[in-house]
Curated annotation (Swiss-Prot):
GO MF annotation terms: cytokine receptor activity
Tissue specificity remark: Highly expressed in spleen. Also detected in brain, kidney, gill, intestine and heart. Expressed at very low levels in muscle. In immune cell populations, shows highest expression in monocytes, and slightly lower expression in peripheral blood leukocytes, splenocytes, neutrophils and mature macrophages.
Organism classification: Eukaryota, Metazoa, Chordata, Craniata, Vertebrata
Organism the protein comes from: Carassius auratus (Goldfish)
Main location: membrane
Annotated protein name in UniProt: Interferon gamma receptor 1
One GO location term (cellular component): plasma membrane
Length: 377
């Protein structure tokens, strides 16, 4: 009987001690996760009871080593410095709560990796920098900062040995352009994309990787016209060139013409000395012509009597012999055939001008004609 009572009391004491120990035990952190990007890796967790005397400690373990962090009161911690060979390893993260001298059990582990071929809960990817788009020669020019320079201090690019390989897909994957960007050669990565047709908006998708580290796809669009238009200067410069050439040639021709004309003026007089000799009539000033009337002396003078009636009465009484004498005297004064000759000469020359003498006149050197007019003094 006493033995049974002793056993019952012992079991009761043990149960009480167990309940006291469970009440004193520190609870473990919950919902452990990892957030990783191009700049680093951060572990996060949750804790049901937050006290000022509670600290947390993060443990990172890879396939070869295990590292513990310093204690922190925050519910997150940057663990980038605790990663070794992030390009190939995968990491297991656990968090332990510490209060006083007591530690909680480790939390559930969380596995992550930057290696796209590793088996992990989460695979960390890199992000492309901001992309600059501009039209160039009828194509869409794509340019962005080289990630090998931009992320050179991040854990993802630690112990780097590979180059960046990226591809641009257009027209819903129908066209694809791939390029390589190196750290030593390029401060920026750039290429040109060709589109099958012209449109108001040009979109494409950018993907890439550095070894086994992959980049998150990035989509970009350019709104505008990328077609190439010939600048105005392409037509202006040839036209100016042709115009200046023609002006230059024209100037040379004018100078040569002036020179030839001056030389010809010097040589022609010596080659043709009498070419410009038009005779004395052309070399002297014209003379003034003076008209001199011929003196005509009357051979017969008739005196009027005082009474015309008396004179007329005397005429019929005059003797015919006297009239014949007068007629013969007047006829003898002109000569026997003077009137006949003058009349015949005038008719033969088709010009009835007995009062204008006929003379020779020189119209040009060596060319003389018959003319009628006053005599030259």
């Amino acid at each position: 009987m006493r033995t049974q009572i002793y056993i019952s009391v012992t079991v009761l004491i043990l149960l009480l001690k167990k309940s006291d120990l469970e009440a004193v035990r520190v609870p473990s952190p919950e919902s452990v996760s990892v957030q990783c990007d191009s700049y680093g890796v951060e572990a996060r967790w949750e804790y049901p009871e937050v006290h000022q005397d509670v600290y947390f400690q993060v443990k990172v373990k890879d396939e070869f080593t295990e590292r513990d962090s310093s204690r922190t009161k925050n519910l997150h911690l940057n663990i980038s410095s605790m990663l070794f060979r992030p390009a190939y390893n995968r990491y297991c993260v656990t968090v332990t709560a510490v209060r006083g001298g007591e530690k909680s059990d480790p939390s559930d582990f969380f596995i992550f990796s930057f290696n796209e071929n590793a088996a992990a809960y989460i695979k960390c990817s890199l992000d492309f920098p901001e992309v600059e788009l501009s039209p160039k020669d009828g194509r869409l020019h794509v340019q962005f900062t080289n990630p090998l320079h931009l992320y050179r201090n991040s854990p993802a690019l630690r112990d780097l040995s590979e180059d960046l390989k990226y591809c641009i897909e257009t027209d819903q994957g129908k066209n694809k352009v791939c390029e390589t960007c190196q750290m030593k050669q390029n401060a920026s990565c750039e290429t040109s994309v060709v589109f099958s047709e012209h449109r108001g908006e040009y979109c494409f998708s950018l993907t890439g990787n550095i070894g086994q580290r992959i980049f998150n796809p990035r989509s970009s669009c350019f709104t505008g016209d990328i077609r190439r238009y010939t600048p105005f200067t392409v037509y202006l410069y040839p036209v100016l060139g042709v115009t200046l050439t023609l002006l230059f040639i024209t100037g040379i021709i004018i100078l040569l013409e002036k020179k030839c004309n001056s030389e010809m003026k010097k040589k022609v007089p010596s080659m043709f000395p009498h070419f410009f000799d038009f005779g004395e009539t052309q070399s002297h000033l014209p003379k003034t012509l003076c008209v001199v009337a011929d003196k005509v002396e009357p051979h017969l003078q008739i005196e009027l009597v005082e009474d015309p009636e008396e004179q007329t009465s005397l005429v019929p009484l005059s003797d015919n012999k006297d009239l014949e004498g007068v007629y013969s005297e007047d006829k003898n004064s002109y000569g026997p055939n003077d009137l006949v000759e003058d009349e015949q000469s005038d008719l033969s020359d088709f010009y009835d001008c007995p009062h204008a003498p006929k003379q020779k006149r020189e119209m040009s050197p060596g060319d003389t004609v018959d003319s009628y007019g006053p005599r030259l003094l």
